[in-house]
Each structure stands twice: as C-alpha cells, then as structure tokens.
C-alpha cells in the first residue's frame, strides 16, 4: 500500500503530531499501546499507510520525532499515547535552538540531521511503495522552522520523486511568543516555496478565534488548539487512510490543488465545529456542513478568502452522506459565490467521500482551499520582517551562527515575489490574452 512517513519537529510539531496520532489511533481502533481492538475491517484495510504492523496485533506509527531538546519528547512519552511510538524513533539533542532559525538550520540542527535521516531511511526502506512524507512544525521557532526546513531539503535530495506535505503553524499577528518570529517564518517560507509540494497553513490566532467564537471556550489551552488541528489533519488524510468512493493520495491532492508549483499554500477548515461536549445534541445536514465549511470564520489561517479568489479547492465529506446531495450543495456554493472562484479554471472544486466519520460524529467535512487571499498572511509576516530587518534588529543572533545578511534579503524578496504572484492570479481573467486586437472587436460590435 501507499505508505507515508511522518516527521514531527520542535515543540509545536511534536505537540500537534502527538494530537494527530491520538486522533487517528482512535479512528483505527488502536488503544494507547497500539493494540488493535476495533470493530470494522475498514479500520484495518489501509492501516499501513501510517502504521507498521508489529507482532501480536500491535501497530506502530511510522513517525519520526525530532527535537533539539528533550523536554517535549519526554512529555509525549509520558502522555496517554506515549507507548505507541517506537523508542528508536525519538531523535533529540540537548542544547535546544532557542527560537533561533540559524541554530536549527545550520549549527545545532545540522549536527543532528544525519541521525534523523538514518531513522527516516530505515522507515522508508520498510515501505512497500512509499508515497511521500508529511511533517508537522511551526515556522516561528528555531527547531521546527530551522531544522524542519533543513530536514525537508535533505529528504528532497534523497527522495526527489516522493511527495512532501507540511502542516505548518504560521506565526499569527496577535498571538506571538517570540520577537524574532517574522525572521524565522520568512526564512522558512523561503525554503517551503522551493521544497514542499503542499503546505497546509495553520495559524494560532485563527484557532484562538474559533475556540472563543464558535466553541465558546473562554480561555482556550494549547490542548484545545491542537485538538482542532488534529481534526483537520485527520480530515485531510482521511482519503489516504480509508478506502473511499473517491480515493486520493498526496499526489492526486497536489495535482488537483496546485495550478502553479510555487502556489502550494492551502487554507484549511473543518465542520462541524462544536465544542467538545455538545456535538451529540443535534444532527448535522450536508447543507449545514457545506455552509459552515466555506464560512471564513471556520478557516484555520487568519486570512479572509473574501479578499481574494479560490484557484482551487477540495472538500472531503465523511460519514453516511449521499453523493448527489454533496454534489448539489457544492455546485450551489459555487454558483452563489461565483466571484470568489477564478473563472479560468473550470471545475475547480474537487469533492471526495469517505464512509467512516470521525469519532463521536455522524458526519463531518474538511475543506482545503488554495486561495489567493493567503497572501495576506505572508504580507503580514513580511511587513514585520521588513520593520525589524531595516534596523538590523536581532540579526547578530543569526550572523553569530554563520548566516549571511544576504540570505535574509533573498528570503525577503522570495516572499514578496510569492505575494505578488498570488496577486497577479487574483486579478487575472479569461479574456487577458485577447487584448491585442482592439480594432477587430470594435468592428464586430457595429
């Protein structure tokens, strides 16, 4: 079967990763130590996309856990699903990256990277037919951002024809935990533009908003945020993990979603968003799911798609859903919001179905959109970057690890290019190629 190797790097990546494994273990009927006690053959059928089978009905995640300090790893190990992971797959340093991208990418991280690649290689060799890699990390820190992007480029070198998907937590405008986030994020985006095939952008602020507005949680914890992220990750990977009517793998997703190679940054959303205790009190319908899924308040990246246009998008419905109803609803959304979809890609909405709903829900839907409005997010980070870089603030932390100012300048301009590429396609229309013949057009009108 088509296996995926999962990597999680840094504190954020490991916490999101742990939540993801907890969610999908539940969906596949595995308990905290990886023993299968599920009820349906469907849970087993494509188990090997994410799990290796060990002896005695036990399944082990094909996950590599990486960090430059032992703290988060110990927390994962002590957590409810800590016994799930293979002990050899924990790779950690002792020094930490101290939120410094250069430490993760060039000094501390570079020392650890070969050790990680050995584990990755071992996992890849055990695969029947590897389809690709997915990595969870944040872009604002040192390890997830710096070392995460280093791993991506090394894996790219060694497995050039395999897919590379990233779940990247982008720094948010209001919720910031380090001053140098804009530097780390810009340097990371510079790498992701070149080396990733699909990047799902998640942003803490949008998650906070969802928790407060929709889930009515007065002070959300990181646990609540990670719960949301794991719901989306579980949704995005559904088609890979369960046999469905419209199956897909990482490559099919990319083929449908990425019209131009650099524009592979997706917004994700999930429905129904209900607070953890309340979901059992009412039934959800397909129209409600569709409406909620396309609601800007549901997007897990702080950019409003109404300020841009969708190049492509994809919706994954789970549960006992009628195909016809889904098709009708999706057509309906497109007709109502026709101005938010570019008209030069016909049929740019893709739907997939899977009959197994997530735990505790009758049906759900996950949304992945490639919208030009994601440029807001890069613009925001870029402005903060420029403000600091103009004064060369904090640069000595990076140059001290051997980085060059030139690299900052390159990263900045690459990100600005990305923003203007999105802008260009936002404004593009079908008739652009015909502007060279104004005379003929006027003749016809007479």
Swiss-Prot record:
Mg(2+) binds at residue 69. It comes from the Eukaryota. It holds the Pfam family Tubulin_C. InterPro entries: Beta-tubulin_BS, Beta_tubulin, Tub_FtsZ_C, Tubulin, Tubulin/FtsZ-like_C, Tubulin/FtsZ_2-layer-sand-dom, Tubulin/FtsZ_GTPase_sf, Tubulin_C. Its main location: cytoplasm. Dimer of alpha and beta chains. A typical microtubule is a hollow water-filled tube with an outer diameter of 25 nm and an inner diameter of 15 nM. Alpha-beta heterodimers associate head-to-tail to form protofilaments running lengthwise along the microtubule wall with the beta-tubulin subunit facing the microtubule plus end conferring a structural polarity. Microtubules usually have 13 protofilaments but different protofilament numbers can be found in some organisms and specialized cells. This is Tubulin beta chain. It comes from Blumeria hordei. The gene is TUB2.
């Amino acid at each position: 079967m088509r296996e995926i190797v999962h990597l999680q790097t840094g504190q954020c990546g490991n916490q999101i990763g742990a939540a993801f494994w907890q969610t999908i273990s539940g969906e596949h009927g595995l308990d905290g130590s990886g023993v299968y006690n599920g009820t349906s053959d469907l849970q087993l059928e494509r188990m090997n996309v994410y799990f290796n089978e060990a002896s005695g009905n036990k399944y082990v995640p094909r996950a590599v856990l990486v960090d430059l300090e032992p703290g988060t790893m110990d927390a994962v190990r002590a957590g409810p699903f800590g016994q799930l992971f293979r002990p050899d797959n924990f790779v950690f340093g002792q020094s930490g990256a101290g939120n410094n991208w250069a430490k993760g990418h060039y000094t501390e991280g570079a020392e650890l990277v070969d050790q990680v690649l050995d584990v990755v290689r071992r996992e890849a060799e055990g695969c029947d037919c590897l389809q690709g890699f997915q990595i969870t990390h944040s872009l604002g820190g040192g390890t997830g951002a710096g070392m995460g992007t280093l791993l991506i480029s090394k894996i790219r070198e060694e497995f050039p024809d395999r897919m590379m998907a990233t779940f990247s937590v982008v720094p948010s405008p209001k919720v910031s935990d380090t001053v140098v986030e804009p530097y780390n994020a810009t340097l990371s985006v510079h790498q992701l533009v070149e080396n990733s095939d699909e990047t799902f952008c998640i942003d803490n602020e949008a998650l906070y908003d969802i928790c407060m507005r929709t889930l009515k949680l007065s002070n959300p914890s990181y646990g609540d945020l990670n719960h949301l992220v794991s719901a989306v990750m579980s949704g995005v990977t559904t088609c890979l993990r369960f046999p469905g009517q419209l199956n897909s793998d990482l490559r099919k997703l990319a083929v449908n979603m990425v019209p131009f190679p650099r524009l592979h940054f997706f917004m994700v959303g999930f429905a129904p968003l209900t607070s953890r205790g309340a979901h059992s009190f009412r039934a959800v319908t397909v129209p409600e799911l569709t409406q909620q899924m396309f609601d800007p308040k549901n997007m897990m990246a702080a950019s409003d798609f109404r300020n841009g246009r969708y190049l492509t998008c994809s919706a994954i419905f789970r549960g006992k859903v009628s195909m016809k109803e889904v098709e009708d609803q999706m057509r309906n959304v497109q007709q109502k919001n026709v101005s938010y979809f570019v008209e030069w890609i016909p049929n740019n909405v893709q739907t997939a179905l899977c009959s197994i709903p997530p735990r505790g829900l009758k049906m759900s839907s996950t949304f992945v959109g490639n919208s030009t409005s994601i440029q807001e997010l890069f613009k925001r980070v870029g402005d903060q970057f420029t403000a600091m870089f103009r004064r060369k603030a904090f640069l000595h932390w990076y140059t001290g690890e051997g980085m060059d100012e030139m690299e900052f300048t390159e990263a900045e301009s690459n990100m600005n290019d990305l923003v203007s590429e999105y802008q260009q396609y936002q404004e593009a229309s079908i008739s652009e190629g015909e502007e060279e013949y104004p005379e003929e057009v006027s003749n016809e009108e007479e």
